[in-house]
A protein has these predicted regions:
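Cysteine-nucleophile amide-bond enzymes
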Residues: 1-122, 126-136, 140, 145-201
């Protein structure tokens, strides 16, 4: 699963899905309905597996911000692990926005002060003195790719300093506090996902 998360992150990076704040998000309405809050809801009758894959094939038809990108990565990682038939059975209702709307089967949880952080973890780089005119840069959700590299939608792919520098360019005038990596990680419930696949086989 961790390998699938990394591969989905790199695929999303290569496809160059547009970065948009929630108020300006857009999606392919063949598969998704856009909510007023900027999230995307699977259209009735659409195959979940096809809808998720469409984000990676018709990329120009999608634009969203970094939290939703992580949600997309998680669903794509599970799709690649489960394959379409099982995925379609497991996820009949999908909402792409943030953790609160995720299917309970994935059930991501945030763990603080871990002894070890691992590739595939979702980390957060906080910008505590963000410019109030650009609140979208108050932080960046990133996927740990291993070897000190990260992917974050809207900023790109690089080491931690790359993300800190990008966020520091969007601080308020006179800011004294640098952006920093939060001592926490968000992870799907790998055990539950594994057991669901095992019991379905």
């Amino acid at each position: 699963m961790r390998k699938s998360i990394i591969e989905a992150s790199l695929a999303l990076y290569r496809r160059r899905v547009a970065f948009r704040i929630f108020q300006e998000s857009f999606c392919n309405e063949v598969y998704w309905n856009r909510r007023q809050d900027g999230g995307f809801v699977l259209r009735p009758g659409a195959r979940p597996s096809e809808a998720v894959d469409d984000i990676f094939t018709n990329t120009r038809m999608y634009g969203t911000e970094c939290a939703t990108a992580i949600v997309i990565i998680y669903y794509k990682a599970v799709l690649d692990m489960y394959k379409p038939q099982l995925f379609d059975r497991a996820f009949t209702r999908i909402v792409l926005m943030n953790w609160r709307d995720m299917d309970p089967l994935i059930d991501p949880k945030t763990y603080r002060g871990l002894a070890d952080y691992l590739p595939g973890d979702c980390r957060y780089v906080r910008n505590p003195e963000v410019d109030p005119l650009t609140p979208e840069w108050q932080g960046e959700n990133v996927i740990d790719l291993g070897s000190g590299r990260y992917y974050g939608h809207g900023i790109g792919l690089g080491d931690l300093d790359f993300f800190i520098s990008a966020l520091n360019r969007n601080r308020r005038e006179g800011a004294q506090v640098s952006a920093y990596l939060v001592d926490a990680a968000t992870r799907p419930d790998f055990r539950v996902l594994y057991l669901y696949r095992k019991n379905a086989s």
